[in-house]
A protein has these predicted regions:
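Buried hydrophobic positions in well-ordered alpha/beta secondary-structure cores of metabolic enzymes
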Residues: 8, 19, 71, 102, ...
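Amphipathic, small/basic residue-rich leader segments at the start of a protein or domain
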Residues: 1-86, 107-108, 112-115, 119
Length: 298
């Protein structure tokens, strides 16, 4: 039977306490006003959460994806907007630089990303394209020593916060044997021609920073290429695979939070003179949910 280590249990308890005492009290108002609390982000950085799966040489905690999943699950119990901010900050923001960046790029970006002093977005999804690389329309062409980028992206998390430093953009950089050559390029926020559009009015996760992006002749140095030219498709698929693990942890946490809320409601709701929790129908439903296998344990 799988069990957490003592260190992992301590991490879970620490993040759960942080979620209940710091995150939860501000969640309703943050969601209502569509505002990501930068104070909460800073405190997550102080706790080392953004650096969990990274080596200490870059400012990380020397942990792994299990540690990250534990933290995201604990946050997801009370606030999925905060949980996805951490997940995207790690999996989509810092991880591409760590996996595919040059040593110079790692030294430039990772210390601030892993400390929560900066965030980064991952510009993959487009109005008509996502993991289908063949449908990508954003282009980047070399002009002297610069990449010139044109196109648009949508639903890009952490792309417009006050501390967002850059977005990694997937773009068509050529053609190989009749197939689009996809590359990834670092585009700093504030680059002329790069616009972070107004945030979305979503049906949920409203405190998560999510924007469409547009590029109209945005020019960045050729050295901003992340990984080898043409390796973008392979690279972003590996990044998405890791991210899906973290999303599963977030979803598990959200389900646990919903179940706990349902139990609390059943105990407090009075019907025909007694608590709803005393009714067998409610008991059976809640017990079935409690005893069902968790995706985390599979």
């Amino acid at each position: 039977m799988f069990e957490l280590t003592d260190e992992e249990r301590e991490l879970a308890a620490m993040v759960r306490d942080f979620a209940e005492t710091v995150v939860a009290p501000q969640s309703y108002e943050a969601d209502r006003t569509h505002t990501l609390s930068m104070d909460v982000v800073a405190q997550m950085g102080d706790l080392g959460l953004f650096g969990l799966p990274f080596p200490e040489e870059y400012g990380g905690q020397g942990g792994d994806y299990m540690a990250l999943g534990i933290a995201i699950e604990a946050l997801g119990r009370v606030d999925q907007s905060i949980a996805i901010t951490l997940e995207a900050g790690v999996s989509l923001g810092a991880m591409p630089v760590f996996r595919f960046g040059t040593e110079e790029q790692k030294q430039e970006y990772l210390p601030d990303l892993l400390a929560g002093r900066a965030l980064a977005g991952f510009g993959l999804t487009e109005p008509e394209a996502g993991s289908d690389a063949g449908a990508t329309r954003t282009t980047a062409r070399l002009d002297g020593d610069d990449w010139v980028i044109d196109g648009s992206k949508q639903f890009i998390t952490n792309s417009g916060t006050p501390i967002t430093r850059f977005v990694t953009v997937t773009a068509v950089t050529g053609n190989e044997g009749g197939r689009k050559q996809i590359s990834t390029i670092i585009v700093p926020n504030g680059t002329p021609g790069f616009t972070v559009e107004a945030p979305y009015d979503k049906v949920g996760w409203n405190a998560s920073d999510t924007h469409p992006l547009s590029f109209a002749g945005a020019r960045v140095p050729a050295g901003n290429l992340l990984g080898e030219q043409g390796s973008g498709f392979r690279n972003f698929l590996s990044i998405l695979d890791e991210g899906r693990i973290a999303i599963a942890a977030l979803s598990t946490g959200a389900a646990e939070g919903c179940l706990e809320a349902a139990v609390d409601y059943a105990k407090s709701r009075t019907i025909f003179g007694s608590a709803l929790s005393t009714r067998q129908n409610a008991q059976f439903t809640l017990c079935l949910l409690y005893t069902s296998p968790s995706p985390r344990d599979s």
